[in-house]
Curated annotation (Swiss-Prot):
Induction context: Up-regulated following macrophage activation.
Protein name: Adhesion G protein-coupled receptor E4
Domain notes: The second EGF domain mediates the interaction with the putative ligand.
Record gene name: Adgre4
Cystine residue pairs: C38-C47, C41-C53, C55-C75, C81-C94, C88-C103, C105-C126, C292-C321, C309-C323
PTM notes: Proteolytically cleaved into 2 subunits, an extracellular alpha subunit and a seven-transmembrane subunit.
Oligomer and partners: Forms a heterodimer, consisting of a large extracellular region (alpha subunit) non-covalently linked to a seven-transmembrane moiety (beta subunit).
Region forming the signal peptide: 1-37
């Protein structure tokens, strides 16, 4: 019963609730039926009187008819500027827009009506029918600010600057003259230029030597020169239009934009610079660098450039610049990046690590050069890599911050570019040689292969980097050296002339490394177990890992700095990348010298001989000078003597090191199988000796 009552109550509630719902649905259906009487209209058309479609205002079907009769008809834009009936006054510039049009003119200043031909100055008095409502800004800079992109602003400003200069010089017969124009928000002065002439506009001055500066354009007479100051244009053409390839933290405009122009049919070339004294807009910052720039217009728009201009002097009130051409000028105040705690710590690690690497690279190079028993193709590669890294690190420590003069900085940047590219090229040759050696362990005539490699490794190791640097210098020599460091500029991707080859070599060496590990694993597993048990597993593993860094593969860690990772991860990667790579010289000395058994024995013999010589000197102080000289002599034979390093009674086969793996067996414990294994290993000894 209770369930039945509940069900009955629910039904009644649903019935009562459905009454207004049904009324609402019925109303909606009625509205839909009414509107359904009008067909679906095409783009730029609307339903009229619920019966047919018509084109919106500013559109027609192409037959001077707005009503759409056939379903396939489309509404097209009306070009009001081409109609027989004039819509703009004679002095106005008519511009067609989609669905409308604009009449542009300068009402209060007819002399500057040409400005309306560059930018849209929408005013009711420009229309034949004054009732047209425009609502647009009439101020020139206000119109420029309505452009959507920087490129559009730059293009409009470039046209404006050129037109203003041309109009003031060529369409203004009243010279000399000093005037202002509120529409353009400018002040200007024109003079007849024959000798040294000083012009002033808006607390800015320009000093030009017309006698020497415009000889080719004067033709013995006077010429007109103009100096224009734009009060508000700097709000648009600000520091963001400066191509900041130098990596400044902030670049701001700190003067009015000024223009210097001469009446001439051709662009004048000045033999003497023009001196510009520009008033500072804001107080100067002691950390900032002041850049004298000019506006360099182009088809893409334009930008601020320092070409042809240099900074002379700056105080709290004004800045003096000198330029060897006439254009539009300004002063930019550029703040360098402040070195935070992380960068400071990384700098300390870099300088300490590179200093230690220099010492190790020097010792390694001396070892590879003077130790005759270990000299082969491998040590030749080690020697060239050590020399390149030593010179590159030394130049980095002493010259990376020598940004003045610019020419010296560019030379240092070019030399660093070459030396580091050469270092990477020798790393590539190291990896290639190691891979070929391991791949041909069964080749008996290995020495001929080594001589063949020497024929091309010097041209590749030194010639190919020279070619890359030469092409880069020809294509963009201005990109060598920046305001902050003597290195490659980031402008237009010039840094890829180094990063491209380096990344390719890192990838190739990484492939070589894993192939070598795979080949060695299969080779070692086939050797006699007694041979393999003689190896020091810890040293072998350590040297195999270090070999990865010696080949430059660790530089690939730097890629993680540029990808989207967490701040903590990026910080860890930055420290890891810096520590590993600045210590590359230490790792080279460690793996190829200190952990090389033969080199260690040579070091011991050398120190033993040196100690004996010192002891001999102390006991023979009273001897003759001739005997003393003989005691002090330490020739190359004594440093690394050629001969057997072991006692004949306990001789072993020459030790072999393959990517950190030593293979050697005493003769007294070798069977025929062991001899084959030892001989097999003997031919692979040059891998990392």
């Amino acid at each position: 019963m209770l369930m039945g009552a509940t069900r009955d109550m629910g039904s009644r509630c649903l019935l009562h609730a459905s009454v207004p719902g049904m009324l609402l649905i019925w109303s909606i259906l009625q509205m839909m039926n009414i509107s359904a009487s009008c067909p679906q209209c095409n783009e730029n058309a609307s339903c009229f009187n619920s019966t047919h479609c018509v084109c919106k205002e500013g559109f027609w079907t192409g037959s001077e008819n707005r009503r759409i009769i056939e379903p396939h008809e489309k509404c097209q834009d009306i070009n009001e500027c081409l109609l027989k009936e004039l819509v703009c006054k004679d002095v106005s510039y008519c511009r067609n827009k989609i669905g409308t049009y604009i009449c542009s003119c300068v009402v209060k200043y007819p002399l500057f009506n040409w400005v309306a031909g560059i930018i849209n100055i929408d005013h009711p008095d420009c229309y034949v029918n004054k009732s047209k409502n425009t609502g647009s800004k009439t101020h020139t800079l206000g119109v420029l600010s309505e452009f959507k992109s920087k490129e559009e602003v730059a293009k409009g400003a470039t046209k404006l600057l050129r037109k203003v200069e041309h109009h003031i010089l060529n369409e203004n017969s009243d010279i000399p003259k000093k005037d202002e124009n509120p529409l353009l928000d400018i002040v200007y002065e024109t003079k007849r230029c024959k000798t040294m002439t000083l012009l002033e506009a808006g607390n800015n001055t320009m000093k030009v030597d017309c006698t020497s500066g415009f000889k080719e354009h004067n033709s013995g007479g006077e010429t007109a020169v103009a100096f224009i100051a734009y009060k508000s244009l700097g709000n648009l053409l600000n520091g963001s239009f400066f191509s900041n390839e130098e990596g400044f933290q902030e670049v701001t405009l700190n003067s009015h934009i000024v223009s210097g122009a001469i009446r001439s049919e051709v662009k004048p070339v000045l033999s003497e610079p023009v001196l510009l004294t520009l008033q500072n807009i804001q107080p100067i910052d002691s950390r900032a660098e002041h850049l004298c720039v000019h506006w360099e217009g182009s088809e893409e728009g334009g930008s601020w450039s320092t070409k042809g201009c240099s900074h002379v002097y700056t105080n709290n009130s004004y800045t003096i610049c000198k330029c060897f051409h006439l254009s539009s000028f300004a002063v930019l105040m550029a703040l360098p990046h402040e070195e935070d705690g992380v960068l400071s710590a990384l700098s300390v690690i870099t300088y300490v690590g590179l200093s230690l690497s220099l010492l190790c690279l020097f010792l390694a190079a001396i070892t590879f050069l003077l130790c005759r028993p270990i000299q082969n193709t491998s040590t030749t590669l080690h020697l060239q890599l050590s020399i390149c890294l030593f010179l590159a690190d030394l130049l980095f420590l002493t010259g990376i911050n020598r940004t003045k003069p610019k020419v010296l900085c560019s030379i240092i940047a070019g030399m660093l570019h070459y030396l580091y590219l050469a270092s990477f090229m020798w790393m590539f040759l190291e990896g290639l040689h190691l891979f070929l050696t391991v791949s041909n362990l069964k080749v008996a005539n290995y020495s001929n292969s080594g001589r063949f490699k020497k024929r091309f490794m010097y041209p590749v190791g030194y010639g190919l980097p020279a070619f890359i640097v030469a092409v880069s210098a020809i294509a963009g020599h201005k990109n060598y050296g920046t305001h902050n460091h003597c290195w490659l500029s980031l402008h237009r991707g010039f840094i890829w002339s180094f990063l491209g080859p380096a990344a390719a070599i890192i990838l190739i060496n990484l492939v070589f490394y894993f192939l070598i590990i795979w080949i060695l694993r299969s080779k070692l597993s086939s050797l006699n177990k007694e041979v393999s048990t003689l190896q020091d597993t810890k040293v072998m593993t350590f040297k195999a890992i270090v070999q990865l860094f010696v080949l430059g593969c660790s530089w690939g860690i730097g890629l993680f700095i540029f990808i989207e990772v967490g701040k903590t991860v990026r910080l860890i990667v930055a420290y890891l990348f810096t520590i590993i790579n600045v210590l590359q010289g230490v790792l080279i000395f460690m793996v190829h010298c200190l952990l090389n058994r033969q080199v260690r024995m040579e070091y011991k013999k050398w120190f033993h001989r040196l100690r004996k010589e010192v002891e001999s000197e102390s006991t023979e102080v009273s001897h003759s000078t001739t005997h003393t000289k003989m005691g002090l002599s330490l020739n190359l034979e004594n440093f690394c003597p050629t001969g057997n390093l072991h006692d004949p009674s306990d001789s072993i086969l020459p030790s072999t090191e393959v990517a950190g793996v030593y293979l050697s067996t005493p003769r007294s414990h070798m069977g025929a199988e062991d001899v084959n294994s030892g001989t097999h290993a003997y031919w692979s000894r040059t891998i990392s000796d």
